[in-house]
């Protein structure tokens, strides 16, 4: 399947999201460089006022797209951006522009030592060098760039800005983060196919790791048995037994409210009742998880891996097709993934996993 047209959690496709955000950022001209024409590309170009160009030599990868795009450029300098970077911040161009001077042909941002050639500034004449390289059989960006005058610019920014959707597992991550973009406050579901898997312990270990990053959490648990908060015979229990539909207790260190309902309220309903000093809502459930969900697996039952599942944490982790899989005790990675899904910035070592 062509990843450019994969549906994201906000209803857009990966490519249409990039085009919309580029247009909103105020770029005067947008050139959509593609390997060949197809109806979806023509329609997207028309919708966002982009100039659609195609590669002179198909199947040559990004190098051919750069050559074709720069040949059609109307300005001396252009931002070359891959269409699969859903979280790129177009304001980064302001940091690159001062370096676009003199003999420089490419302003190449680097992050944690990684080149970002598909989020770089290129001078128009660099396109000729790409075309010449392709003609002689060179299509690797690294080889071509070494023949140009390149100004490397180390950046200390959120690694998520350069995250690209190169794999089905990365697509799941992107959908989870975009789902949270559309919410007033982000949600993370922790689910497991069977009791005894360790959902509570997993969340208990995750919370302090998030707190180090300043994340204030609330946890909402699904219960299938019914519950009574107070001890039988105590005041609030007696009020409920007498027929009160709700009771509340206020104390110097907090409060709780218990309300009887005729049917289970969904998590969103409960979230709306919690005060706004919370940064992340974690929901614990066996089957009622929302996107994004971290699925836990201890081998007690087969986990249901549907579109809501963003990553799998399992005992004796093994590779899982199209899904990130980690050891059930790898809480540092769980925290990094959670921060990414929240849209929180990740720097240095914390962000490297989202660059590769």
Model-derived segments and spans:
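Nucleotide and nucleotide-moiety/phosphate-recognizing core
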Residues: 1-138, 146-160, 169
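Short, charged/polar "capping" segments at the starts of alpha-helices
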Residues: 20, 36-43, 227-229, 301-305, ...
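Short internal beta-strands
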Residues: 30-34, 108, 219-221, 249-250, ...
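Extreme N-terminal, non-catalytic leader segments
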Residues: 172-189, 196, 327-351
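Walker A (P-loop) phosphate-binding motif
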Residues: 182-225, 347-356
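N-terminal phosphate/diphosphate-binding loop that engages ATP/GTP or pyrophosphate donors
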Residues: 205-262
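Phosphate-binding/switch loop-helix module in NTP-utilizing enzymes
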Residues: 259-289
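Phosphate/Mg2+-binding loops and adjacent switch elements
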Residues: 280-346
């Amino acid at each position: 399947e062509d990843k450019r047209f994969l549906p994201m959690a906000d209803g857009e496709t990966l490519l249409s999201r990039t085009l919309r955000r580029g247009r909103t950022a105020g770029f005067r001209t947008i050139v959509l460089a593609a390997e060949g024409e197809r109806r979806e590309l023509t329609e997207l170009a028309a919708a966002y006022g982009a100039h659609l160009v195609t590669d002179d030599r198909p199947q040559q990868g990004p190098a051919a797209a750069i050559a074709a795009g720069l040949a059609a450029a109307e300005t001396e300098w252009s931002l070359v951006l891959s269409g699969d970077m859903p979280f790129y911040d177009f304001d980064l161009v302001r940091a690159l522009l001062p370096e676009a001077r003199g003999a420089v042909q490419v302003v190449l941002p680097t992050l944690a030592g990684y080149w970002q050639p598909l989020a770089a500034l290129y001078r128009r004449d660099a396109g000729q060098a790409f075309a010449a390289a392709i003609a002689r059989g060179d299509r690797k960006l690294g080889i071509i760039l070494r023949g140009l005058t390149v100004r490397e610019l180390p950046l200390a920014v959120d690694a998520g800005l350069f995250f690209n959707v190169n794999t089905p597992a990365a697509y799941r991550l992107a959908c989870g983060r975009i789902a949270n973009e559309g919410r007033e406050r982000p949600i993370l579901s922790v689910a497991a196919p069977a009791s005894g898997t360790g959902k509570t312990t997993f969340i208990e270990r995750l919370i302090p790791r998030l707190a180090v990053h300043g994340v204030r959490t609330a946890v909402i648990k699904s219960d299938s048995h019914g519950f009574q908060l107070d001890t039988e015979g105590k005041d609030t229990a007696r009020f409920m037994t007498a027929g009160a539909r709700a009771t509340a207790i206020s104390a110097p260190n907090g409060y709780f409210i218990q309300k009887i309902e005729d049917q289970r309220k969904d998590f969103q309903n409960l979230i709306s009742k919690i005060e706004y000093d919370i940064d992340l809502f974690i929901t614990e459930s066996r089957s009622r998880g929302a996107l994004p969900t971290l699925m836990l697996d201890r081998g007690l039952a087969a986990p249901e891996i549907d579109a809501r599942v963003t990553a799998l944490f399992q005992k004796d982790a093994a590779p899982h097709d199209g899904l990130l899989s980690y050891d059930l005790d790898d809480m540092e990675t769980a925290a990094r993934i959670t921060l990414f899904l929240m849209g929180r910035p990740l720097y240095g070592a914390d962000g490297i996993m989202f660059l590769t």
